Amino acid sequence: AAAAPAHDHASHAHDHDHECGEACGHDHSHDHEPGHVHSFPDARGIYLISPSSAVRDPQTVELARERLAAQGFKTALDRTALAEHQRFAGTDAQRLASLTRAAKQKLPIVMVTRGGYGMGRLLHLVDWKAMADSGKRFVGMSDFTAFNLALLAQTGAVSYTGATAIYDFGGKKVDDLTEALFGEVMRGELEILSFETQDADPVDCRGILWGGNLAMLASLIGTPYMPKVRGGILFLEDVAEHPYRIERMLIQLWQAGILGKQKAIVLGRFSDYKLAPHDKGYDLHEVVAWLRKTVKVPVVTGLPYGHVATKATLPIGQKVGIATEKGLAHLVLDEHHH
């Protein structure tokens, strides 16, 4: 369950011949709703910020910038992106100011260098309306889930989760699929993300796509930064969490009334954990079985998303479709109805 998917586990296409969502009884008058995918041919500029943990090796950021440049992206580094204060990338005031600068500068994409910890300290200080009004495509992962969800809860604006500078572009090699999907999503070109699923309930519906890191999601329950999404498509991942800890957070989401209101629960990768002799057969499969039995919402596994090399960049807060067939799931990001 923790293995990174092979390259053929996910594919991307520019056309499709099935309409996802008929079974949900929706009409198709959503083409001009907020959150609909638009084409962004100008998406060639990236402003890099560090709102969470400190960057310990600046060379990883330089390498990421070189690789992004090779993909045709112009990059700019925020003045405190390499700052250090304790475990953080600068003081709270410095990190908050970097978000404000990011919203005001000219480049269309704002990408975090890395996750870690620290975004939660800033949620009550951020001018969320200014973030939404900036029209920037904010993209991050892990700890940045707190920003993604707070922006959605406070404004309804769409932001992105997936690629980050250091993890995906600053390491030994760049995953081809991660790179391609990031570019396509930033340009508004990705219409369908199809991926292999070994374990999926039948589902064919539309709803708001939301989620991200499970621990961050659980940490926002009961706060003004937790979106109130009904009939959504909730996707989840986590790293270095034992299955019982994953289950405990899922129980919290369920008992808080959140899981039961969704149309589908999509599981990404839960990576880097070790089972113990005490588990005696209890593993991630048991957690998924418990989830299905208890929550009674369709569950789809295998989403290429998480703390793994091959990952999709996904829009949080956008209306999407999801459909499953034998061994495959299709996440429909852009639906054309002629």
What are these regions (language model features)?
Residues 109-120, 125, 141:
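N-terminal glycine-rich "phosphate-gripper" loop used for MgATP/nucleotide binding
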Residues 228-284:
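Internal helical hairpin/lid segments
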Residues 2-38, 338:
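Histidine-centered metal-binding segments
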Residues 104-109, 262:
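Short acidic/histidine-rich motifs immediately flanking catalytic phosphotransfer sites
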Residues 128-150, 158-164, 298:
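Short, acidic/small-residue loops that bind anionic groups at enzyme active sites
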